[in-house]
Each structure stands twice: as structure tokens, then as C-alpha cells.
Amino acid sequence: TSRGSCSFTLSMNPRLRSCLYRGCYGTIMTMETSAATCDITGVIAGSICGFEMFAEMDLKVFKSYILIKEVRLRHCMDPALTAAIISRESHGGTIRQDGWDHKGLKFGLTQLDKKKYRPVGTWDSKEHLLQAVGILTDRIKANQKKFPTWSVAQYLKGGLSGFKSGTEATATPADIDDVISDIIARAKFYKRHGF
């Protein structure tokens, strides 16, 4: 469907519960990333191992964010992906001053750019997360309309690219960069840790 790979109804049948847990926009654990993997020497900048190291540092903070799992119900988005975006952008809100970046241009757990979006709510509020995940799902749907032959993984990655850049749809699959691989690698880590 245009909403993703699952139909969304309010009944809580087993298929829907499974769909809500993983989200309607692809299965994170099967998605490939373009970053280098770890080798015996350990963490490499820009590697899956490096991305997961940062995700692990933020894991304690996410245990208290019940909102991440609540937002999935509204937008049918995998909570592991939401946690990964928050980890990538704000380390769970631990490194931001009153929710703003050091230049005062990006706001909240997901660091929405005020030039591209009009952030709502407080920096760590349900309203902020609903807005950010809503923007992401809109970007995914824009790619579904523009590129009907893309795979589910390309829709999700293209949506993430559009979310980060502030554009409605990605131009080509090649526009999907290392930042997206970082987010997917972190999402896989969070999926393995209960999200």
C-alpha cells in the first residue's frame, strides 16, 4: 500500500502487532549498509562497528524514552529507526543545549532544521517526535510515488535522505549516503536490544 508494507487498522491482531513492532516501511535487519564493517583492529571511523559503538553509548538514555515506542502507533514506524535517528542527531538529547544545536538552527531530539521545518513542542516532547516521524513517513511516501519500481529498502533509505536534506524525494538511489548507513546500522543495534 502507499502507507508501507502493512495495512493499518485499529484491531490488534497478531499480524498487526508484528507489523507495528517492525514498522510498515521495511525490515531494518535485512537492509544493507554501505559503510565498512569492523575488522580485528576494532573501531574504524565510518564503520558499522563505529556506528554501533555510538549507539551503545546512547542505549541507557533510550530506556527512559517511552515516547519512541508510542510514536510507532501513530506512524507505523519501527521504534529502532526512531531511536537511531535520535542517537545520530542528538545522542538522546544529552549533548544539546535546551534542545538546540550549537548554531541555534536545529531543534529537538531529531534536530529538525528550523529553516526547513517549523519544529513543534519542546525538544523532547511527543509532539516533536510525532512531527519528525511524520515528516519521515511523508518523505518515504513521496519516494513511493516518484519511484514506483524502487525496493522497500530504497524507499526507506530515500525517505531518510529526504528527511535529512529537507527535500521531498530523493533524486536517485545514489543520493543515499553514509549518514543513512549510520542510521541503519544504529537501528540494527537498537533492534537487537529490544526496540
Feature map (PLM): residue ranges:
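Non-catalytic cell-wall polysaccharide-engagement segments
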Residues: 2-46, 54-61, 73-75, 113-195
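Mobile, glycine-rich extracellular loop/lid and propeptide segments
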Residues: 65, 69, 90
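Residue-level detector of well-ordered alpha-helical segments, enriched
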Residues: 77-82, 105-108, 155, 159
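Structural recognition of the beta-strand scaffold that forms the well-ordered cores
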Residues: 81-87, 108-111, 128, 162
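A short structural micro-motif
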Residues: 88-92, 166
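Extracytoplasmic/secreted cell-surface and envelope-processing proteins
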Residues: 94-97, 171-172
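Short, surface-exposed glycine/acidic/tryptophan-bearing loops
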Residues: 96-118
